[in-house]
Swiss-Prot record:
Homodimer. This is Homoserine O-succinyltransferase. GO terms for molecular function: homoserine O-acetyltransferase activity; homoserine O-succinyltransferase activity. The keyword Lipoprotein does not apply. The lineage of its organism: Bacteria, Pseudomonadati, Pseudomonadota, Gammaproteobacteria, Thiotrichales. GO terms for biological process: homoserine metabolic process; methionine biosynthetic process.
Length: 385
């Protein structure tokens, strides 16, 4: 039986120890916004870390007081759900460089007394994982029972297995890739140019100028959203349906798919109030992710020290991070005789499928989480039901 997580309150960890970053820059101090769900058991062995994707944040489940919107993965986290909060203590933090409570471009730079803006240092998946490890230490958790993430979150999971192999028992990598393709880097560059050429961007100092590059953000989101959807899904959802039932022979919105994309862009740029500099940072972190680069471009070698057990999930119509990209990860793990489970899930929803309801996906996910719970309690899967 499933139930819902109720009202949640975000927490904040202030870290006064400087963070040495991959770029060579240093954050003198920083805040990490995070949320937790469920209860930590006596030996603190049931903790799960969720790593979010590009536009995500730490609000992964439940809802805030006075708000109706639920967390971005609420369908999969809660009592009786695949990530069962009756069994697990779930943690999710907002990535550094974000705009939802963790230190980012809109935060005050303690060295200048002004907002960081474009001066915020470039962040990488490795930087995020090292800050998340600081949160782990703060929570006095010896090791995560599992680290779980989809898309960019899956990249962080892989980085965890490389940088902190003794602190992660299971790694669940969903709809992800070991590095971006040239095409994906190109999509990110077009999105960045849309933002940076908006007259309201002001070289990233738009907060000081009292503006917001909404047009650029909306265009970037429209492009990104296109890559998250499959052709089949767009065809079945919109086809060539006209908004007014007839052609008007002008450049206003005529097709329903145009209306949908404009709505998604405007919502992201206005209602969600996403910081433009954060968007630039997140896309760059995606571009830079390539753990094999430090191991002679050999992914098998990069993952050779990983001791976690793995679940890798891909989706048939995901062309942003196609199943073939997951196969690369699977092969590298098999080269190392890793304990690995793999599922390729049928879905018409493209890359966004990892966020949406799907019986096959949920079944695989639920079964694997039951396995983790059974291992924690030293029981068989039947006893661990």
């Amino acid at each position: 039986m499933t139930d819902e997580i109720g009202i949640v309150t975000p927490q904040k960890l202030h870290v006064s120890t400087p963070l040495e970053m991959v770029s060579g820059s240093t954050l003198p101090e920083y805040d990490l916004a995070y949320e937790t769900y469920g209860s930590l058991n006596a030996d603190k062995s049931n903790a799960i870390l969720i790593c979010h994707a590009l536009s995500g944040n730490h609000h992964v489940a439940g809802q805030y007081e006075g708000e109706s919107t639920r967390g971005w993965w609420d369908g999969y986290i809660g009592p009786g759900k695949p990530i069962d909060t009756n069994r697990f203590f779930v943690v999710c933090s907002n990535n550094l460089g974000g705009c939802h409570g963790s230190t980012g471009p809109a935060s005050i730079n303690p060295l200048t007394g002004k907002v960081y803006g474009p001066d915020f240092p470039i962040v990488t998946c490795k930087d995020w994982v090292h800050s998340q490890n600081t949160l782990r230490q703060h929570l006095e958790i010896d090791a995560w029972a599992a680290v779980i993430g989809g898309s960019m979150g899956g990249m962080q999971v892989l980085q965890w297995t490389i940088d902190f192999p003794d602190q992660i028992r299971h790694a669940i990598v969903i709809a992800s890739a070991p590095k971006l393709s040239a095409q994906n880097i190109a999509f990110n560059e077009v999105a960045r140019r849309a933002i940076m050429t908006d007259p309201d961007f002001h070289d990233g100092r738009f907060i000081e100028a009292g503006t917001t590059p909404k047009r650029g953000l909306a265009l970037a989101r429209m492009l990104g959203h296109l890559t998250y959807l499959s052709d089949d899904m767009m065809g079945s959802k919109f086809g060539r349906e006209l908004r007014e039932g007839k052609l008007n022979y002008n450049f206003d919105v005529e097709f329903q798919v145009e209306s949908y994309l404009r709505y998604q862009g405007e919502k992201f740029a206005t209602k969600q109030n996403f910081d433009a500099n954060t968007y630039l940072l997140m896309t760059k972190a995606l571009d830079y992710f390539d753990p094999a680069a430090d191991f002679d471009d050999d992914l098998s070698k990069a993952l050779s020290g990983a001791t976690a057990k793995f679940l890798i999930i891909s989706f048939t119509t995901d062309w942003r991070f196609s199943p073939e990209r997951s196969h690369e990860i699977v092969k590298a793990l098999l080269d190392n005789d890793a304990d690995i489970s793999y599922a390729e899930v049928n879905s018409q929803h493209g890359h966004d499928a990892f966020l949406l309801p799907n019986d096959h996906y949920e079944g695989v996910f639920r079964a694997y989480m039951k396995r983790i719970h059974a291992e924690l309690n030293h029981t068989s899967l039947q006893e661990g039901e």
